[in-house]
Amino acid sequence: MTKLQGLQGLKHIKAVVFDMDGTLCLPQPWMFPAMRNAIGLEDKSIDILHFIDTLPTEKEKKEAHDRIELVEAKAMKEMQPQPGLVDIMRYLTKNGISKNICTRNVGAPVETFVKRFIPSELSRFDYIVTREFRPTKPQPDPLLHIASKLNIRPLEMIMVGDSFDDMKSGRSAGCFTVLLKNHVNGHLLLEHKELVDVSVEDLSEIIELIQNMNKESF
């Protein structure tokens, strides 16, 4: 575990929000290039969902969504869980800390992942926010929505993710941010370290982090 920001002034952690792709499940680096190829988006600086939203007709938007959902369906079949997944789910459930998911994916892959890889007694999530909620990450709105529904302050919530969008959304919302490092996102610690409070390599490392944060908050 690597601490990039100080822990001073933190409150008791009452909720954790997880990204899904690359966070709860192992990274699938081929997926986003495949989506861009499917909709003819060559400019990597343009957000996929934003590109679709700006298409001129509803027919074109639907066709583009259908194409990326085919890619997501393939990815869904190949999903594998992150190391430490069950450990962190068990800890949060046992200690009454709210579990939530915020993803730019659609609902079906989330439901499939939860049923396939998380034991039923640990599989209850308070809120699952997908891309049907707008605006999506990297805007703070999805996380602020979850905090509001839970009746907690954003600073009492951790955002766990593997991407710029996750860290930007978490920081903008006022949450504590945890970057799950992998073989393709190390650049975030160099280029956007101001967005990351702590980086981990295994989801189970978050257990010790929460224990320390909640101990220090009293």
Swiss-Prot record:
Its EC number is 3.-.-.-. It is an enzyme of class 3 (hydrolase). SUPFAM superfamilies: HAD-like (SSF56784). CDD domains: HAD_BPGM-like. One of its GO terms (molecular function) is pyridoxal phosphatase activity. Keywords: Cytoplasm, Hydrolase, Nucleus. It is found in: Cytoplasm; Nucleus. Disulfide bonds: none annotated. GO terms for cellular component: cytoplasm; nucleus. Present with 396 molecules/cell in log phase SD medium. NCBIfam families: HAD-SF-IA-v1 (TIGR01549), HAD-SF-IA-v3 (TIGR01509). Belongs to the HAD-like hydrolase superfamily. This is Uncharacterized hydrolase YOR131C. It comes from Saccharomyces cerevisiae (strain ATCC 204508 / S288c) (Baker's yeast).
